[in-house]
């Protein structure tokens, strides 16, 4: 599958004309949101997808800024031929309220004082971020989104969208996140905040325009956070216990290990692009996030109407699989249409930003709903039920296949025989095909989604499914190899 970048892009600014009322009861004036768009909005305005960024992300999700050395943060899935195909969809991403990459936040000018807000900026929530995004979507003339998609804190925003504005999207893809922040997640954020607040140059948030800023505290906060984005396995693979630019231990407090050097690099790079006060405000918004009502998640989600996709990462210990499954259970309890997938990766939490093939496959299947008809093989060798086992072996050998659908004279599916069945027939001294074939065979329809049949094949440990019509007549087959090839094409 041929893929391209969206190319050169520019960040735009949307100004909210009226006051923005916040969850705290306070209001903000002159709010601006930085945003980028990719692709074209169709005439009916039905092809828009909102992408929500994670904690330290921004509006630059794809493409290249002028003189940039790297593309947007989700380049792997946004662009022509990718899951968020900009030849098909109009993709929108905005910097969150409280951010520092063009949207109004604590580093912005307070219209009442003509100075930076600093700690006069009100506490914000994920709900406030989404409320501001809604105004942007309305400004773009979009009444209903095709989908809202987000990972990590972006997944929280996507979830909040489904609760706050249930009629404004068809689909929601919720990735590597939770429906309510856990004590451990809150604890990590608090340690990060304290590292900033304890920096002597934080100066109670009043460091704008000064020569010294809380760079050290913000760098440590980033180092702490970055550890949670990785997995133990990924750190072993990337660093092991290798030393950094030395052959032996130094026996002092300089950097010995590569992993130490890496974390320092992450911290030093981060302070060049992020505001310390924004980090305080955004992590507090994450801590406050809880969609349950009186402890009940189903009660908090009872009004959602979107079709859901939940994607977890098997090595994610920041937002572990169990939290995604809690969300899945709550939605299933409500009878909401929902699918669940786990990305297999050593990368940890950051896998949703890095696993090109798996993320494109899962998102593409959900957003575009690829169906069996797109992949199935129609030129399929079959065998008559009255044939012998030797006949089956010859057909398999001649056609280099391991599965043979068994059909009658009208091509009606009667069963399936596999190479494994033929092996068993030798041990049991069977002669007739009917004695070894599977009669109660699982099958699918050409209109079934690839996502659905992938789950079925995994659940029942099946590598091949016959495809039948409404009369149970054979139309073709689909195999796990074909699905794997689709994944590898991204």
Curated annotation (Swiss-Prot):
Main localization (coarse): cytoplasm
Pathway participation: Amino-acid biosynthesis; L-methionine biosynthesis via de novo pathway; O-acetyl-L-homoserine from L-homoserine: step 1/1
Compartments where found: Cytoplasm
PROSITE patterns per UniProt: CBS
GO CC list: cytoplasm
Reactions accelerated catalytically: L-homoserine + acetyl-CoA = O-acetyl-L-homoserine + CoA
EC number: 2.3.1.31
Annotated InterPro entries: AB_hydrolase_1, AB_hydrolase_fold, CBS_dom, CBS_dom_sf, HAT_MetX-like
Assembly behavior: Homodimer.
Protein name as annotated: Homoserine O-acetyltransferase
